[in-house]
Amino acid sequence: MIVKTRAVVLREIKYRDQSKILTLYTREFGRLACILKGGRNPKNRLSGIFSAGNVLDIVLYRKPEREVQLISDGSLVSCPMVPGPDIERFGVLYRIIDLVRLTTEHDGRSPRLFSLLESTLLELNRERVAYRTLYAWFLLRFISLQGFAPELCRCVFSGREIAADAAGGPRGELLFVMNPGGLALPGTACTDGRNVRPILPEAADLLAALSRTSTAESAAGGSGIPEGSAALFCGTLLQEYCRHHLEHTGGQKNLAVISQLLAE
């Protein structure tokens, strides 16, 4: 059956002399393994567009019983090379597509996840984007779709409102608890140090702001908060939080290298 769908390229590997095996995340079918015959032949008009991180409209010869689907056509929608190559954009890009690839099942359709992924990458591929803030927003939305949204308004132990308590005392005395997930006031419970991370007030404020940010476009604009170390911290924290709650977030070495690049 010939079908059309929008897709994000999650991974590409060489196959034989001139072809590619691709891992795609598609709007209609979820994650698929596909082959692009002649995809590495410079004379093939499709050879340059099926690259990791690209958003495409594609045509497939799809058979549900077949493990690898055949790509017959495609057109580019968005590419991280436009407006130009950028190490920070690429760092965020590969974190995002690796996370989706490693945490989704074959043929596991999720329109909400595809919408999140597509909208994030479309913003990521624009100029003057708050990359770190956008990445933290994506992680917060992603983990919420998995059913592990952290509590950012009330203390996970006492139930008291974080903003009200912080206003009445010294700032900086907050904790982020991996399980149960969310913010906690100091002294509310005896916690395992491996399960808790201290969090500065500006980072807690950013998390709260991102939880109220409904679109990737708004997050890419910084959600009204200047891009800085708080955004980097939130991205790293939420990445660890995702890893804590999900079973298949591999790629530890790759993520560590990219984290170092983004910190420089």
UniProtKB/Swiss-Prot annotation:
Q: Which Pfam families does UniProt cross-reference here? A: RecO_C, RecO_N
Any one GO CC term of this protein is: bacterial nucleoid
Keyword Nucleotide-binding attached: no
Keyword rRNA processing among UniProt keywords: no
Superkingdom as given in the UniProt entry: Bacteria
**InterPro entries to which the protein is assigned, alphabetical:** ARFGAP/RecO, DNA_rep/recomb_RecO_N, NA-bd_OB-fold, RecO, RecO_C
Entry keywords, A to Z: DNA damage, DNA recombination, DNA repair
Q: Which GO biological-process labels does this protein carry?
A: DNA recombination; double-strand break repair
Q: Cite the HAMAP family for this sequence.
A: RecO
Q: Which NCBIfam families match?
A: reco
Q: According to its UniProt entry, what is the function of this protein?
A: Involved in DNA repair and RecF pathway recombination.
Similarity section: Belongs to the RecO family.
Its protein name is DNA repair protein RecO
Organism of derivation: Chlorobium luteolum (strain DSM 273 / BCRC 81028 / 2530)
The gene for this chain is recO
